[in-house]
């Protein structure tokens, strides 16, 4: 088996890992996921194979992409953010997002984004509330269920005591990439999850990753096939992530230093153990606030700042 470089673990995994630029791009970054699964070469075929692997119970034979305008605007005219949305020949909708980091109200946000696909169907006319099933698929670069080894979670609307489905209209699938491993008995979905999370760390394609879906995945991530313009954009994106990583590390170091100082002072007056704990918390909070202010001054997008802030606030 071809081994990937060791991956970073913990709450900063989403920006600490895959900063090395080698043969393959990190396609879990938003712009490059969209390129691989919507824009480049046989992206339509790659997305189809991915959906077939995730949802084998549905006979998905072909897909079409929703327009950018309909995907990123809800019926009230407010903008929303979806990486890729498509539908199959039967009218089933698939909303696919890469989730970079855990955040407050994570599931609520998934429900919020999935319902717009339903509303757009009903706006087409008629007085019926019948709509085609919608699947929200979250590819997660973090572990939402830390105490479990499961990497794939499925949810639907059902009666609580019997499990009887209330409707076939809404489904949620979450793939926790960090929990995917490349083993002899790994399922196709687990292999895909592992490849998505580790492809930018590889110098060659592992023998275990055989088949058309991996042919297309590795082709789309091959940096030698990027246009000169895309190569520049990719390098800029990686540089931005490095800058953010360094800012976070500086903030944490500064916060720890301030926290130790405050902790010692409070410890003398209120008892060393409790004083140190409170001082560290306050110092870390100050360091994070300073980092966020610096990021805004340097023009870092608010969406990325929010992700970083959420990560820093984790224990």
Enumerate the language-model features and the residues they cover:
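Elongated, amphipathic alpha-helical interaction scaffolds
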Residues: 2-315
């Amino acid at each position: 088996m071809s081994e990937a470089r060791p991956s970073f673990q913990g709450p900063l995994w989403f920006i600490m890992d895959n900063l090395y630029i080698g043969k393959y791009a990190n396609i879990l970054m938003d712009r490059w996921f969209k390129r691989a699964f919507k824009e480049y070469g046989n992206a339509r075929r790659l997305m189809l194979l991915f959906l077939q692997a995730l949802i084998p119970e549905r006979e998905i034979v072909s897909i079409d992409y929703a327009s950018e305008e309909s995907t990123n605007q809800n019926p009230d005219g407010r903008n929303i953010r979806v990486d890729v949305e498509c539908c199959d020949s039967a009218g089933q909708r698939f909303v696919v997002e890469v989730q970079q980091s855990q955040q407050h109200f994570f599931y609520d946000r998934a429900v919020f984004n999935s319902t717009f696909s339903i509303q757009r169907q009903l706006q087409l006319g008629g007085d019926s509330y019948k709509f085609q099933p919608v699947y929200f698929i979250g590819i997660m670069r973090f572990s939402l269920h830390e105490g479990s080894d499961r990497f794939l979670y499925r949810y639907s609307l059902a009666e609580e005591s019997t499990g009887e489905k209330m409707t076939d209209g809404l489904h949620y699938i979450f793939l926790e990439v960090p929990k995917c491993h490349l083993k002899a008995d790994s399922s196709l979905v687990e292999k895909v999850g592992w490849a998505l999370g580790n492809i930018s760390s590889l110098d060659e394609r592992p023998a275990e990753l055989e088949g058309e879906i991996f042919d297309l995945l590795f082709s789309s991530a091959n940096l030698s096939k990027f246009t000169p313009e895309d190569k520049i954009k990719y390098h800029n994106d990686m540089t931005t992530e490095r800058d953010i990583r360094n800012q976070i590390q500086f903030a944490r170091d500064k916060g720890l230093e301030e926290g130790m100082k405050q902790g010692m002072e409070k410890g003398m007056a209120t008892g060393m153990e409790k004083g140190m704990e409170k001082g560290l918390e306050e110092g870390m909070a100050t360091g994070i606030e300073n980092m966020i202010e610096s990021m805004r001054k340097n023009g870092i997008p608010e969406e990325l700042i929010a992700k970083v802030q959420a990560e820093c606030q984790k224990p």
